[in-house]
């Protein structure tokens, strides 16, 4: 037997809300801006060097000749020919990836002086130079904490002319495969010249953005924790049944959607324990994936429907972008109040009566 929410005109409701993202959990860092979001990168360095060489840096006998940053793009939101331009500032307040969220942003202190030059951007590489004195200060601080300002790293902040958002894999401490590398050339005149490649040991992004105006759509947005909740009234569904399939289907509103590359082409669906607090049930680790095909995201939530029919309270479904930490995409679906009922979320349940 079958129950189709569209054919049976079942009551439903949908909406979206903003959760608080922990930026340190992302495996990607984003920089850039568009009409609804701006993203900046924080990176912190610890350059390991023998004490004997640090002492030479402090005394001015081991000199930083150049410092060049190279980063390999892995994500794009917007036109690839659009402008990406940013400034690099020295951070003067302590920060950590642990617990860094939108409430941490106002407490960030940085110098207003841009310490970067020679920025070049293409599809495969972002490259720029850092003032030699910046790295020299880091090394001097390592040698003697009283000889230079404390090193809290760098802030990469987009300029107003920027019209796209680009992402890079976040660095993993001690990994030899990191794709964000600062190459530092040091020289002891007439004696030695060395090149040291170092990656950030703290490497995160933070994104500030506008939450879209509440309308009839069900909208998701990466980087700011914009999630959705969806409820179907299944009181007309018999209790003593076995649910074989329950296909949940959402239609994309392409006019309100901006997707990136790689695409935010899946949604995670989890069962809610409380529709008000958005608390999840104890089996919240069980996630159903809604996959995209053409302009429709669909997945089988039969196990959720079965739990509700077995007596668990139907508080609805929590939905989120699969890549909400590593994307700035905005994906909009037609919601439960859309004037065109055929475009609203659909739930088609296939079941059999228990004998």
Question: Which residues does each predicted region cover?
Answer:
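Secreted, disulfide-rich extracellular signaling modules
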Residues: 1-355
């Amino acid at each position: 037997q079958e129950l189709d929410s569209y054919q049976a005109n079942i009551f439903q409701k949908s909406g979206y809300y903003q959760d608080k993202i922990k930026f340190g959990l992302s495996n990607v860092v984003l920089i850039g801006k568009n009409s609804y979001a701006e993203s900046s990168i924080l990176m912190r360095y610890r350059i390991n060097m023998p004490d004997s060489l640090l002492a030479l840096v402090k005394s001015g006998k081991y000199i930083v000749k150049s410092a060049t940053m190279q980063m390999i793009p892995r994500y794009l939101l917007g036109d690839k020919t659009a402008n990406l331009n940013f400034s690099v500032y020295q951070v003067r307040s302590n920060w950590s990836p642990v617990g860094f969220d939108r409430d941490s942003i106002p407490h960030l202190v940085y110098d207003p002086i841009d310490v970067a030059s020679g920025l070049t951007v293409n599809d495969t590489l972002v490259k720029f130079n850092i003032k030699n004195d910046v790295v020299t200060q880091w090394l001097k601080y390592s040698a003697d904490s009283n000889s230079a300002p404390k090193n809290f790293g760098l802030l990469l902040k987009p300029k107003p002319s920027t019209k796209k958002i680009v992402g890079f894999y976040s660095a993993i401490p001690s990994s030899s495969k990191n794709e964000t590398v600062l190459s530092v050339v040091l020289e002891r005149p007439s004696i030695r010249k060395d090149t040291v490649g170092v990656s950030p040991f703290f490497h995160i992004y933070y994104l500030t953005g506008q939450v879209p105006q509440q309308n009839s759509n069900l909208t998701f947005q990466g980087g700011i924790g914009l999630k959705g909740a969806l409820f179907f009234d299944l009181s007309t569904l018999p209790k003593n049944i076995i649910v074989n399939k329950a296909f949940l289907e959402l239609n994309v509103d392409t006019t309100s959607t901006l997707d990136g590359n790689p695409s935010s082409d899946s949604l995670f669906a989890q069962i809610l324990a409380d529709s008000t607090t958005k608390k999840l049930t104890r089996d919240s680790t069980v996630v159903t994936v809604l996959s995209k095909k053409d302009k429709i995201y669909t997945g089988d939530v039969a196990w959720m429907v079965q739990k509700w029919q077995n007596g668990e309270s139907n508080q609805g479904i929590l939905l989120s972008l699969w890549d909400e930490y590593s994307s700035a995409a905005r994906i909009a679906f037609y919601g439960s109040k859309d004037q065109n009922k055929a475009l609203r979320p659909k739930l088609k349940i296939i079941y059999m009566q228990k004998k």
